[in-house]
């Protein structure tokens, strides 16, 4: 079974969201390097990243960038071919920076910062009064099945479940699932599994020509896939934050 797993450390980690907006989490505040990396992404996959909406996430930095540096980064990313549209929610300094830059602050990222905040330990809970009957456990939603082809420009989303496609996913089409994705035809478009962050989701495909595959936001484009895996039946999974692709025996 052949596989691919390329390990590298980039200044910015780009994750693909379920609504087509990418989240660029800044690891190293090196503006020229970040711009070069984005130019490389756009060059390798212009249909995917050209004029893509990007959210900037400074939460991984020890210090919020100053206004001049942030402006230089926004200008550089625009020149690289993408469109910075917002900052990810963070500290009060990031809130102020978003106002100075004149771009929105997206509160959908609030939880990842608030859970990391240091807070005093909670007081001990009061002794339980009496045992209450256990609440019924919700059953997972049944998987979604798509019998017809998913054509160019169409997007299919399976919320809180797996997605099974019995036909082809055409070039320019997008299939998304919070769980795993099973494609019994040809995959020429994009497949995004674990869209709500599930790292255990997988993608299974009978005929692999995907423009992009992603699991929990981590992605790989077709140009990064070895030729010997194209046109094969494959599985795609996430291991140590790296996409791995292997032929099915």
From Swiss-Prot:
InterPro entries assigned: CAP/MinC_C, MinC, MinC_C_sf, MinC_N, Septum_form_inhib_MinC_C
Protein origin, superkingdom: Bacteria
SUPFAM superfamilies noted in UniProt: Cell-division inhibitor MinC, C-terminal domain
Biased composition (Pro residues): 119-130
Gene Ontology biological process terms in this record: cell morphogenesis; division septum assembly; regulation of cell division; regulation of cell septum assembly
Region (Disordered): 116-149
Keywords: Cell cycle, Cell division, Septation
UniProt biased composition (Low complexity): 131-142
Family: Belongs to the MinC family.
Function of the protein: Cell division inhibitor that blocks the formation of polar Z ring septums. Rapidly oscillates between the poles of the cell to destabilize FtsZ filaments that have formed before they mature into polar Z rings. Prevents FtsZ polymerization.
Subunit text: Interacts with MinD and FtsZ.
Name of the featured protein: Probable septum site-determining protein MinC
Organism: Xanthomonas campestris pv. campestris (strain B100)
Gene symbol of the encoding locus: minC
């Amino acid at each position: 079974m052949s596989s691919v797993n390329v390990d590298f450390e980039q200044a910015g980690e780009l994750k693909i969201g379920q609504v087509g907006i990418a989240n660029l989490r800044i690891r190293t505040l090196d503006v020229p390097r970040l711009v070069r990396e984005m130019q490389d992404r756009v060059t390798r996959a212009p249909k995917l990243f050209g004029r893509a909406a990007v959210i900037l996430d400074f939460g991984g930095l020890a210090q919020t960038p100053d206004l001049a540096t942030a402006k230089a980064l926004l200008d550089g990313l625009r020149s690289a071919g993408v469109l910075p549209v917002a900052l990810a929610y963070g500290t009060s300094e990031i809130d102020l920076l978003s106002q100075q830059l004149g771009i929105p602050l997206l509160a959908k990222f609030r939880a990842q910062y608030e859970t990391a905040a240091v807070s005093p330990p909670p007081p001990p809970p009061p002794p339980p009064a009496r045992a209450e009957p256990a609440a019924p456990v919700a059953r997972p939603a049944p998987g979604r099945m798509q019998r017809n082809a998913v054509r160019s420009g169409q997007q299919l989303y399976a919320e809180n479940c797996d997605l099974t496609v019995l036909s082809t996913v055409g070039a320019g089409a997008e299939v998304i699932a919070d769980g795993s994705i099973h494609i019994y035809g040809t995959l020429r478009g994009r497949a995004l599994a674990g869209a709500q962050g599930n790292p255990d989701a997988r993608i299974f495909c009978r005929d692999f020509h995907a423009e992009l595959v992603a699991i929990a936001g981590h992605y790989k484009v077709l140009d990064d896939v070895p030729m010997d895996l194209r046109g094969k039946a494959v599985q795609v999974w996430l291991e140590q934050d790296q996409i791995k692709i292997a032929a099915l025996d």
